[in-house]
């Protein structure tokens, strides 16, 4: 079974794929990362496509003719927030702290995060928040992987607006995650079958498995909200 999608939800899907294989003896190969790295292969042989949010899935449907959104499943959600350096040297405690003078901010302006920083800045309907944030944004990364690579290589960046699970991926020695209830935005992972996947009984079973109660522990482990 061949499953493709972005890097964000991939750790969850890969761990659940191994658990599914243990239970059913059906091998699930999860290929993940920036879209250009896998989209051509996915067009040829994908059973399932997963995404990090709805606009990403809608875009996949335009690029992969065999992908059907009629049987799409909305999966778990995760919060946005701010990654800062370990020990928080700039003492960033909430969203408004990254609007202060002298804070160098990076955002992801592509993939599953188009418009995310704007949504966070304007959640309280304060126009001045976006004005200040725009002045502090130094880097617009094209996707999360590019942002994480830049974070690791550029110590001049003080704060990164991104999803919670990327802090876990970076590790405690490289990142501290700040969640501000006044700015948090939630978006959901999704999964859908191709025509090939619809004919694969095991693929449909895998979709049911990743939505199951048993799977929720794994989603939670990677900072996604459990589905009760």
Language-model-detected regions and their locations in the chain:
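Conserved mixed alpha/beta catalytic, RNA-binding, or beta-rich assembly cores of soluble enzyme
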Residues: 65-67
